[in-house]
Regions:
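OB-fold and OB-like single-stranded nucleic-acid-recognition modules
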Residues: 1-199
Length: 199
């Protein structure tokens, strides 16, 4: 009886914890794979640690993936303004990172939590934790923001709206799509803070 009741006791006694900025600080954010990731182990296990840019390429052939991402990008590029929600979050982010020049100047809006990068004064990332296929393929995805006048603390949930521009990120040694903020409003944490990729 004690053995069977232990999981129930633990489940009701310990609080539920969600991933947040503390997790980002502990794991770091890198592009496209986390630093120190053993790619040979990933290949043998079929898993990957993803940060900033969702990457679904390993789930399709190269031609199929290129076709899917191109269609996805075209669908959102045809919109005058893109509202990113829980259902399309990973799809839109992957399209933005795959075609940053085409999305430059595009207005987008989405909800995420704030992460203050100690290396970027007056710049904040807005992230969501996402799951691509299973928990082994999870990561933190979002955009660097600039121009916001309100500097929120880590883990503050915000609705951010602005236009995509491309800026060089010194630590990652590459150009990243960046959101030039038009509005940055504090919101309540969503009931489900995670986003998922539907295949």
């Amino acid at each position: 009886f004690a053995l069977l009741s232990l999981p129930l006791l633990v489940g009701f006694t310990f609080p539920t914890v969600t991933l947040d900025s503390q997790t980002v600080s502990a794991k770091g954010y890198y592009f496209p794979l986390s630093e120190g990731t053993d790619k040979a182990i990933q290949a043998s296990e079929g898993t990957s640690s993803q940060f900033l840019k969702p990457d679904t390429s390993r789930f399709y052939s190269q031609a199929a993936h290129e076709n899917i991402i191109r269609k996805s990008a075209d669908k959102y590029l045809a919109q005058s303004s893109i509202v990113i929600n829980d259902e399309n979050y990973l799809e839109v982010m992957e399209a933005i990172y795959d075609f940053p020049n085409e999305f430059e100047g595009k207005e987008i809006e989405f909800i995420g939590f704030v992460y203050n990068d100690p290396n970027h004064t007056n710049s904040q990332f807005v992230f969501r934790f996402g799951i691509m296929h299973c928990i082994a393929d999870s990561g933190v995805f979002g955009l660097l923001t600039t121009g916001n006048t309100n500097q929120y603390e880590n883990n503050t949930w915000v609705r951010v709206k602005g236009k995509i521009s491309n800026h060089y990120h010194k630590e990652l040694n590459q150009v990243l799509p960046t959101l030039e903020v038009q509005s940055f409003i504090k919101v309540d944490k969503p009931e489900n803070p995670y986003v998922y990729k539907e295949f």
